[in-house]
Amino acid sequence: MRLITRSDFDGLACAVLLHEVEQIDSIEFVHPKDVQDGKISVGSNDILTNLPYQFGVGLWFDHHSSEIVRNEDTASYRGRFEIAPSAARVVYNHYVEKGKGEKLLRYDGLLQSVDKSDSAKLSMNDVTKPGGWMLLSFVMDPRTGLAYHHGYRISNRELMTKMIELIAKNPDDPDTVLADPDVKERIDRYFQQQEAFTQLMRERSTVEKNAIITDLRGVAEMPSGNRFLIYTMFPQANIQVRVFDGRKGEFVVCAVGHSIFNRTSRTDVGALMDKYGGGGHRGAGSVSLMDDPEQQIRMILAELKANG
């Protein structure tokens, strides 16, 4: 079967688990917007994980709350959907019920870290001094920005494929995974650019009522950095609106996330993003805006401030 998943830590964990329980012949790492826009053709021999549902797919696994709004017909697919800390946890739960859980038990430590990372149940220390699987989660997260830099020994897609086997061989030993030369060169860049990233966040961010607005449009070279650091810098805010240029400048991306330390926001972000054609969870989501993005951003911000 062909596995189609997201290019992040959760998508990677899904791939690791599915390799244990299904015959995976090929893997594609894709952007959720391409799936939403119908640019990815799927069929009965495909597995879709951590991505929006597409009619006709063989198996679908997801946990994004926005999919409840988007797809009311839950009888038309095979696989599993549930509100869970991660899509990898949904995959795990499905195969445990199918009697194949024994093959997946050795990934318990990895799964706990994926759950913690994807649901953003992190401590201040996890963000400022990450290590182990948590550090890997930030390195593999496209939002960290490491993939936009060049000069690596292998491409990011090649690294994702390599990581599946590397994790399978070392399910209880994240330090061995982190020591791999192709992983380590990305870790080194992550820490080298942390100061520049923090400075840029301060320069490009303002606070309106309860919301941080970080406008990164026009930034030619974005330093890599942890997207959660912003909440350590503005602890009084409970939500962030992050705006940046989309692929090839064809659209504007608006990413919204609850503060992981000041958890007082009343906005269901996934539902709000769905209204504009995006998606996500209650605590985080994004949307790609093509028509009059400025007005739509102000409308999104107004709702966030009104909700408190």
Which role does the model predict for each range below?
Residues 117-210:
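Hydrophobic, aromatic-enriched interface-forming segments
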